[in-house]
A protein has these predicted regions:
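Non-catalytic cap/lid and distal C-terminal segments of serine-dependent acyl enzymes
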Residues: 1-215
């Protein structure tokens, strides 16, 4: 998600090249997906069924056919930050047959979707059977503002989603960091996040909280 940001402010192509060169991850093919306008971004990344279908049924098959590569039968890793983090987790929830690993940096998990109630995605995971998904979630300890003011903050909603996923039996690697909602923080952690998520094992449920006042 937010492909423009992940090729500039978070230099993922360079990060991937370095990790592959150093043998820290296997060779990968990366697709950077953007939205046509800010309004389209707001609509498409808010757990849109149409957007999830586009990613799973058009974008991923396009990679295989265009680049003449075989898509991993164990699933595709999907990543994003902010609304993109929400969209990544939503796409995996909608299409677990395609996406198996979710990397969400400061995900906007407070969002309500169409029912008007906040934290829509956490409620979907709580009410559904466990899916074959692994998660790397991170959020900044300074992300305590509510948007809008009546909704939980990114920090609170990330903690809630973490608790729901762990209670349902998902493999979750969760980090709280001394940072805000900013690309500088995300670029500093993306490489390690990718390494940890790709190396996740059956029994891994790791929670890393750097706050002295956490829940």
């Amino acid at each position: 998600m937010d492909g423009g940001s992940y090729t500039s402010m978070v230099p993922v192509p360079t990060i991937l090249d370095n990790l592959i060169h150093d043998g820290k991850i296997p060779p990968v093919v990366a697709l950077f997906v953007g939205n046509s306008s800010p309004q389209a971004r707001d609509n498409e990344l808010n757990c849109s069924d149409a957007w999830g279908d586009f990613l799973a049924k058009e974008a991923v098959p396009w990679i295989g056919s265009t680049m003449n590569v075989r898509v991993n039968t164990n699933g595709v890793l999907i990543a994003g930050s902010s609304m993109g983090g929400l969209a990544a987790a939503c796409a995996a929830y909608q299409h677990p047959e395609t996406f198996r690993k979710v990397l969400a940096q400061s995900g906007s998990f407070y969002h309500a979707n169409i029912d008007g109630e906040p934290e829509w995605l956490a409620r979907q995971f709580a009410q559904s059977k466990q899916l074959p998904l692994d998660f790397y979630l991170e959020v900044g300890l300074l992300e305590t503002s509510s948007i809008p003011s009546r909704d939980p903050s990114m920090l609170t909603s990330s903690r809630h989603l973490r608790d729901v996923l762990i209670a349902k039996g998902y493999r979750v690697d969760y980090h709280e960091r001394f940072s805000g909602h900013e690309h500088l923080a995300w670029r500093a952690t993306f490489g390690d996040a990718l390494i940890e998520l790709l190396a996740m094992r059956e029994t891994d449920r790791r929670v890393h909280i750097l706050s002295s006042d956490h829940q």
